[in-house]
Amino acid sequence: MWQLWASLCCLLALADARSRPSFHPLSDELVNYVNKRNTTWQAGHNFYNVDVSYLKKLCGTFLGGPKPPQRVMFTEDLKLPESFDAREQWPQCPTIKEIRDQGSCGSCWAFGAVEAISDRICIHTNAHVSVEVSAEDLLTCCGSMCGDGCNGGYPAEAWNFWTRKGLVSGGLYESHVGCRPYSIPPCEHHVNGSRPPCTGEGDTPKCSKICEPGYSPTYKQDKHYGYNSYSVSNSERDIMAEIYKNGPVEGAFSVYSDFLLYKSGVYQHVTGEMMGGHAIRILGWGVENGTPYWLVANSWNTDWGDNGFFKILRGQDHCGIESEVVAGIPRTDQYWEKI
């Protein structure tokens, strides 16, 4: 009997796969297919003439990896608003508005972490300390504990590294901001641009424990530490409460090729092949035309999506968006002597 049932399941899965049209990830046909479905979002071209290998490398997060213990939260008495945007809640913290660019490197796991950490340092010091935490330092110096550098990594281990070893400051490529700015250049994965072309190739830079010339303090003195790191349960309310009380979090989800075409609205997967796991920064929530969403910052520059941001369906663990949330609290005692 079970063999008959297994055969039936296989046939149904095959029929479902055949009923879904197959499109090139960046094709006009895929854009038109999504938009004709009249779903909750609009598709358009964000990439032009790039290798599929590059697109898959952008999704550099290993899903289902190790997780730190969950933090117990008591949110029953907390009144959460219908909509929340960390950019508006903490306008004095400039990093919350910032969109970075990971370039030709699967470093999203590091970017989601350092972006949220930067935000939280500002929030938890009442805007007395505003710093761009270095994605370069995390990407290059965490080593095998975090994964495989530009070939992918584990968001939870990124936060653990922050608490154990600390992270120095470092801004965007060629910004000369902080101790270790990002060394991988942005590439032209977008339409009608002037940057060099993107490829799926690119080695992880070397770990350097020296700040760039002209910057002080020293590498060791520039370290920023976390007090703790933890997982957040996949409860919609717990994630909202965490953001509301402590600031943006890092999340991760499964990316399908239709997501690459996101322009506006609330993303829900329509069709397309699986590209990989992708880490991002969740900074708020709301409801658009009756559809609940998470407000999310990507790391594919500002000419992707909605000025670098996107919205994705909230409350249904869509593409796993609520299953991989991690966060932490900064060690604020290291700052009070300097303030």
Curated annotation (Swiss-Prot):
| Glycan attachment positions | 192
Q: Which key words are in the record?
A: Acetylation, Cell membrane, Disulfide bond, Glycoprotein, Hydrolase, Lysosome, Membrane, Protease, Secreted, Signal, Thiol protease, Zymogen
Q: Which GO terms describe its biological process?
A: cellular response to thyroid hormone stimulus; collagen catabolic process; decidualization; epithelial cell differentiation; proteolysis involved in protein catabolic process; symbiont entry into host cell; thyroid hormone generation
Could you say which enzyme class this protein belongs to?
hydrolase
Q: Which residues form the active site?
A: 108, 278, 298
Query: Which residues are part of the propeptide segment?
Result: 18-79, 334-339
Membrane topology classification: Peripheral membrane protein
List all disulphide bridges recorded for this chain: 93-122, 105-150, 141-207, 142-146, 179-211, 187-198
Specify the superkingdom.
Answer: Eukaryota
Gene Ontology molecular function: collagen binding; cysteine-type endopeptidase activity; endopeptidase activity; proteoglycan binding
As its record notes, the protein acts as a catalyst of:
Hydrolysis of proteins with broad specificity for peptide bonds. Preferentially cleaves -Arg-Arg-|-Xaa bonds in small molecule substrates (thus differing from cathepsin L). In addition to being an endopeptidase, shows peptidyl-dipeptidase activity, liberating C-terminal dipeptides
Coiled-coil segments, which residues?
none
The secretion signal range is 1-17
Indicate the family of this protein: Belongs to the peptidase C1 family.
- Protein name, as recorded: Cathepsin B
